[in-house]
């Protein structure tokens, strides 16, 4: 019974309240901080749990009054409202009881890279980047371009951005994968639809202490930064390319005029990429069930199609199709695609955890 599962949360919340008032805890800053964080994390569940228990009590109380000649009609009305609220609360509580993804509150690095389709793929990298930018603005997030490689035809061969704000990873973690675009290129005289693809990687921002990199594992090259067509964008050797020898990962940054800043940015992106690899290894070790629960963000999997002639966007993981591609891309309304993905993910987790 759900009520029985909720009581331990209420008990623990009240226990922490008592502990935080004791002199033994108030003199220990670390212990006090840890307890405060734990209390904050369970507070939403406790709040809903108390409301739920009150609803259950009110339902029983109103049932007893149904035959009362004076209060029967009022009890019937209240009972109707309470019976409607009960399942709503149950669903809200189940979502709150889902084990939390430790990365959900992190900022992210979002890497968009042109794949098959040449110029069209690069142009779509630019289009999708701008759509994410609008979605970020709608959520009050901040976006910083970490590195970019322009395409001569417009758009980007590759762009890496840092997205900062509340719940960034929790909302964008399902964007990792292959995004396919179908449209008529501006240069196509016959009006034929071309198909191209880009890949998106979502990497949580990590602290320096979480990923340690041995300097001996790095090969660092500096070079003259260049723009479209190879023209020099500044006259110093400020561009930095870092190769992580054990993994073979290569990160390049030339967006800043300072070599030191470019190296610092490249190292941050490298750490995020290495953290992503560690996450994948951990999921492999925990098995396919865990992989299904958290969503893999596998870059090789085609996750979504953007069909411009039909004004259609389709997410293949949940069989979602919307004929609002123009609004979603131009107004940053990615919530229309992302929210159903989150809801589907939550329902799978509720089932997997027996809630």
From Swiss-Prot:
Gene3D superfamilies (UniProt xref): 3.30.160.20, 3.30.70.1660, 6.10.140.1950
PTM sites of type N5-methylglutamine: 231
Coiled-coil region(s): none
Chief location bin: cytoplasm
Family annotation (Pfam families): PCRF, RF-1
Subcellular location: Cytoplasm
Molecular function terms from GO: translation release factor activity, codon specific
Protein name: Peptide chain release factor 1
Organism from which the protein derives: Aliarcobacter butzleri (strain RM4018)
């Amino acid at each position: 019974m759900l009520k029985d599962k909720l009581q331990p949360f209420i008990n623990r919340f009240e226990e922490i309240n008592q502990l935080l008032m004791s002199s033994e805890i108030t003199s220990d800053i670390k212990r006090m901080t840890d307890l405060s964080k734990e209390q904050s994390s369970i507070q939403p569940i406790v709040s809903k749990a108390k409301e739920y228990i009150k609803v259950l009590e009110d339902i029983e109380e109103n049932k007893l009054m149904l035959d009362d000649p004076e209060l029967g009609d009022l009890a019937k009305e209240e009972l109707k409202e309470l019976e409607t609220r009960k399942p709503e609360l149950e669903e809200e509580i189940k979502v709150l009881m889902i084990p939390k993804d430790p990365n959900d509150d992190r900022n992210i690095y979002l890497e968009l890279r042109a794949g098959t389709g040449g110029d069209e793929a690069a142009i779509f990298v630019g289009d999708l980047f701008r759509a994410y930018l609008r979605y970020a603005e709608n959520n009050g997030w901040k976006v910083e371009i970490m590195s970019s490689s322009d395409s001569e035809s417009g758009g980007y061969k590759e762009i890496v951005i840092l997205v900062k704000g509340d719940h960034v990873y929790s909302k964008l973690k399902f964007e990792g994968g292959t995004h396919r675009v179908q449209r008529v290129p501006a240069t196509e005289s016959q009006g034929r639809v071309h198909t191209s693809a880009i890949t998106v990687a979502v990497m949580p921002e990590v602290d320096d202490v979480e990923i340690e990199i041995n300097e001996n594992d790095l090969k660092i090259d500096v070079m003259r930064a260049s723009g479209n067509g190879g023209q020099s964008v500044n006259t110093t050797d400020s561009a930095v390319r870092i190769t992580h020898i054990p993994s073979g990962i290569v990160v390049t940054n030339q967006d800043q005029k300072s070599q030191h800043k470019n190296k610092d940015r490249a190292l941050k992106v490298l750490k995020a990429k290495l953290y992503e690899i560690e996450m994948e290894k951990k999921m492999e070790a925990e098995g396919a069930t865990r992989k299904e629960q958290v969503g893999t963000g596998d870059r090789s999997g085609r996750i979504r199609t953007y069909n411009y002639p039909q004004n259609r966007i389709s997410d293949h993981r949940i069989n979602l199709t919307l004929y609002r591609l123009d609004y979603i891309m131009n107004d940053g309304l990615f919530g229309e695609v992302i929210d159903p993905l989150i809801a589907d993910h939550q329902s799978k987790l509720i089932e997997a955890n027996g809630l």
